[in-house]
Amino acid sequence: MTKRIAITAGEPASIGPDLVITLAQQAWPAELVVCANPELLLARAAKLGLPLRLIPYHSENKPQPQAAGTLTIAPFELAAEVECGVLNELNSAYVVDTLRFAGEKNMSREFDAVVTGPVHKGIINQAGIAFSGHTEYFAVQANCQDVVMMLAAPGLQVALMTTHIPLAYVAKAITRERLHHIIHILHKELKSKFGLGSPKIYVCGLNPHAGEDGHIGREELDVMIPALNELRAQGIQLVGPLPADTLFQPKYLQDADVILAMYHDQGLPVLKSLGFGKSVNITLGLPYIRTSVDHGTALELAGTGLADSGSFTCALNKAIELASKVSN
């Protein structure tokens, strides 16, 4: 059966619309329902010199593969005119509305997955809308106590214990309870969505040298090791905590299904240096499939035709792949 994939185009002044239009230049085996302003997409397509025909979305219609040069559109109204590369806080509610719609329709099973384009967190918050990121937004909307942010690139998958919080708050956020929640989600989702029979999870320490036996911090001794031992007793394959500065080596990576980093900038710089533009952000623990690009808004490239659609293409392919594994 053909899958129906929601796509949010993201910040309207960014490269998000450009990338969605670029994706439309090829045929896809799923129906692509873009949550965006139709006039914005048509104007951006004209600016880029790319053909685009928009097909109105009707939920009662059976999903059909997307023909090249077309997108199915779920229309949303902008509050202000869009200028490429220029943020306008008046359009922040528009951005969040597209996310709300995509999340709701996935939870009701009207859609089979959502792929999200880049948003600008700063301008959304400047508009008075509390927003720390897609991952956190969808988790709250779906009433999930915890979700896991995982980025996947060829040969490496990195999941995060904490996401978009200040570094000063990270140590307090790493508790036995949270380690249990995050690792259980990771273990379960790697089995159910990725088909891994017994996933092997390698865990980074929090402190330099994984605490050096308590001489450079006690979080490993007091919190992490007891929690990991409890989880091992439940049959989960865990290695660590290991020093993060030496963990990302071939001798470890060849055996690891995923690396669990303790904070955002511990694991993602390594992954992005190896596979930037080819990696996919996947949210685990939601009641539906969500993938995303691995980059930001790149405002300076909006409307220029220079934006690289590689990550968006990977994210869409991964969403279709994962959705195809789910029973209809």
Swiss-Prot record:
Catalyzes the NAD(P)-dependent oxidation of 4-(phosphooxy)-L-threonine (HTP) into 2-amino-3-oxo-4-(phosphooxy)butyric acid which spontaneously decarboxylates to form 3-amino-2-oxopropyl phosphate (AHAP). Its EC number is 1.1.1.262. One of its GO terms (biological process) is pyridoxine biosynthetic process. Belongs to the PdxA family. This is 4-hydroxythreonine-4-phosphate dehydrogenase. PANTHER family: 4-HYDROXYTHREONINE-4-PHOSPHATE DEHYDROGENASE (PTHR30004:SF5). Its main location: cytoplasm. Its cofactor is Zn(2+); Mg(2+); Co(2+). Signal peptide: none annotated. One of its GO terms (molecular function) is cobalt ion binding. One of its GO terms (cellular component) is cytoplasm. Substrate binds at H134, T135, K272, N281, R290. Pathway: Cofactor biosynthesis; pyridoxine 5'-phosphate biosynthesis; pyridoxine 5'-phosphate from D-erythrose 4-phosphate: step 4/5. It is found in: Cytoplasm. The active site is located at the dimer interface. It comes from Shewanella denitrificans (strain OS217 / ATCC BAA-1090 / DSM 15013). Keywords: Cobalt, Cytoplasm, Magnesium, Metal-binding, NAD, NADP, Oxidoreductase, Pyridoxine biosynthesis, Zinc. A divalent metal cation binds at H164, H209, H264. The keyword tRNA processing does not apply. It holds the Pfam family PdxA. The keyword 4Fe-4S does not apply. Homodimer. Coiled coil: none annotated. It catalyses: 4-(phosphooxy)-L-threonine + NAD(+) = 3-amino-2-oxopropyl phosphate + CO2 + NADH. Binds 1 divalent metal cation per subunit. Can use ions such as Zn(2+), Mg(2+) or Co(2+).
